[in-house]
């Protein structure tokens, strides 16, 4: 049983690192309902260029989610402690409005199929790890909404129903324009953003304190936004406390997410319930131990 807990808990928090990048690009429709695809297409590159850096970053939330869906590619690199040099890559599709997604994740010889449906994370583990699941199950699941309720999730960071809505409250001093670059053949403007943890906590002092303990005083993020105002690449770097390493050295987790093929079809279903083991309790306990 202890071996099973360690194995599945590790899988959960491996996925949590990946969800950091995904979450910041998903569920953006939860804030504002305004806008349409037609109004997005009507936006010109001239109007985008006329915006200040802060205005461009604040507007990308609505512009990107108006596309509804996209293909996604991501890379998560961990450094520090025993995780030094670990790298996970993934690609798949995502609904940008509600966070529904399907990804194939690769770490060395191991491949994990990951789905998020209705704020529930599902992972089909590699064969050796799946042997540790109870009753011969092949999929594990974690209810991310329940995890957040129980203190195992960061609002706006690893909840796929969260959003980029915090960008609307950024001031000019939080955003720096770095220049222009091509991402996947598309011309973009590169911005550096520093997230304000006080604003992310939305006035919740306890949540702000927890965010600072987990992430530090500042969270650096970089965005590449195209001439239509849509996010093409996002890079975020976090200092996180690894599970089971209380008092140990924090690890640096760098997540890079790229979006392309906006409007692509996204059809994701949860795996059969008979093949799924609910690991939400283990994930919540592991999160509390690492907080």
Task: Enumerate the predicted regions with their spans.
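A generic, residue-level signal for flexible/boundary positions that often mark functional hotspots
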Residues: 19-22, 253
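C-terminal motif of bacterial Sec signal peptides marking the signal peptidase cleavage site
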Residues: 24-27
């Amino acid at each position: 049983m202890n071996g099973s807990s360690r194995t599945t808990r590790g899988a959960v928090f491996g996925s949590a690192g990946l969800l950091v990048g995904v979450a910041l690009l998903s569920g953006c429709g939860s804030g504002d309902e305004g806008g349409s695809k037609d109004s997005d297409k009507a936006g010109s590159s001239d109007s985008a260029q006329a915006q200040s850096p802060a205005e461009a970053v604040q507007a990308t939330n609505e512009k990107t989610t108006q596309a509804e869906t996209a293909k996604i590619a991501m890379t998560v690199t961990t450094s520090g402690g025993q995780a030094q040099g670990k790298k996970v890559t993934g690609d798949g599709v995502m609904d940008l409005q509600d966070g529904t997604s399907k990804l194939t994740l690769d770490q060395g010889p191991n491949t994990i199929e990951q789905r998020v449906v209705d704020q529930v994370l599902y992972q089909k583990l590699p064969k050796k790890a799946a042997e540790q699941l109870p009753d011969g199950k092949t999929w594990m699941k974690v209810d991310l909404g329940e995890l957040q309720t129980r203190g195992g999730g960061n609002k706006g960071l690893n909840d796929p129903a969260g959003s980029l809505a915090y960008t609307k409250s950024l001031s000019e001093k939080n955003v720096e324009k770095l220049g222009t670059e091509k991402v996947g053949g598309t011309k973009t403007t590169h911005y550096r953003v520093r997230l304000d943890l006080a604003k992310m906590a939305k006035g919740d002092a306890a949540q702000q304190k927890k965010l600072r303990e987990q992430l530090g005083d500042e969270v650096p993020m970089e965005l590449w936004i195209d001439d239509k105002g849509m996010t093409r690449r996002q890079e975020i770097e976090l200092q996180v406390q690894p599970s089971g390493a209380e008092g140990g050295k924090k690890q640096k987790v760098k997540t890079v997410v790229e979006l392309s093929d906006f409007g692509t079809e996204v059809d994701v279903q949860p795996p059969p319930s008979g093949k799924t083991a609910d690991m939400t309790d283990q994930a919540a306990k592991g999160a509390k131990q690492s907080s």
